[in-house]
């Protein structure tokens, strides 16, 4: 994953004092926060070693003005299944065709395992979410992603899902250099890309096409779910959704209100 460029020594560490550090964060009680755990790693990769999951769950339990999102590509949900999960916590999975998982997402759970884990937590009453990220453009991608959408819609109801996001392959130069120097077997750097606001990604036209294709497969859920694009320009939002948020604050407010409305006792500050 390109986020490996966030780290310099390649080591994975676990913070033994996470609970204390979280409790020292100065949160404004009059503001709302959407906190994503696993943004540059994987929230469930190490389970509850050193109490890292319990520390985060306790943090969410004590702060009703936050939404805590665990982001993962794993099947490591054993601790969450046997633990009380606060209502303001949800778990999200990245979804991609199995062929992409096999060739690019080494060591992660299969597509069916991810969906099965999401269903297990959903059956427990835990809200789940899905990230179609990165959506990869290749011959036949439409049918592969349509298959994923059909699986999601057959296994879940809209009220069980916090949100669905979409994003594409986007690289900063250090990430490209890191992937090349690592010598990993990957085809992602063979994909034709252009400069996109200082990064390498698909053209705007290709992005609009792939986002629209996936979004339109969810047409029956358009009014019941919060859909958004990951780090895309307003012109692409408008092309896909017919509108865009005028500011990041507007987007964050809309996301928080939509997700929190599906969380039973969560109070909006």
Q: What are the functions of these language-model segments?
A:
Residues 2-92:
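Conserved Radical SAM active-site core
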Residues 21-28, 79-84, 111-124, 214:
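Structured alpha-helical segments in the cores of large, soluble enzyme domains
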Residues 40-44, 75-78, 89-108, 134-139, ...:
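Conserved radical SAM core fold
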Residues 122-132, 139:
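A conserved active-site cap/scaffold subdomain adjacent to cofactor or substrate pockets
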Residues 153-269:
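Auxiliary Fe-S-binding modules of radical SAM enzymes
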């Amino acid at each position: 994953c390109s986020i490996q460029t966030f780290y310099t020594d390649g080591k994975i560490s676990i913070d033994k004092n996470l609970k204390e550090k979280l409790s020292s964060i100065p949160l404004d009680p009059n503001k709302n926060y959407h906190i994503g755990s696993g943004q540059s790693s994987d929230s469930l990769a190490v389970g509850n070693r050193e109490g890292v999951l319990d520390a985060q769950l306790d943090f969410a339990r004590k702060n009703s003005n936050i939404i805590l999102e665990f982001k993962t590509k794993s099947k490591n949900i054993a601790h969450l299944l046997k633990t009380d999960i606060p209502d303001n916590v949800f778990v999200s999975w990245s979804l991609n065709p199995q062929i992409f998982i096999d060739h690019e997402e080494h060591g992660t759970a299969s597509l069916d395992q991810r969906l099965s884990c999401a269903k297990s937590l959903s059956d427990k009453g835990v809200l789940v979410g899905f990230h179609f990220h990165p959506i990869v453009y290749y011959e036949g991608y439409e049918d592969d992603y349509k298959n994923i959408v059909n699986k999601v819609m057959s296994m879940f109801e809209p009220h069980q899902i916090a949100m669905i996001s979409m994003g594409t392959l986007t690289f900063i130069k250090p990430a490209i250099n890191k992937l090349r120097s690592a010598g990993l077997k990957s085809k992602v750097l063979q994909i034709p890309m252009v400069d996109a606001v200082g990064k390498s990604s698909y053209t705007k036209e290709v992005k609009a096409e792939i986002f629209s294709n996936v979004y339109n497969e969810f047409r029956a859920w358009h009014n019941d779910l919060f859909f958004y694009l990951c780090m895309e320009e307003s012109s692409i939002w408008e092309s896909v959704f017919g509108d865009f948020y005028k500011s990041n604050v507007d987007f964050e407010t809309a996301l928080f209100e939509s997700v929190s409305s599906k969380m039973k006792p969560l109070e909006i500050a």
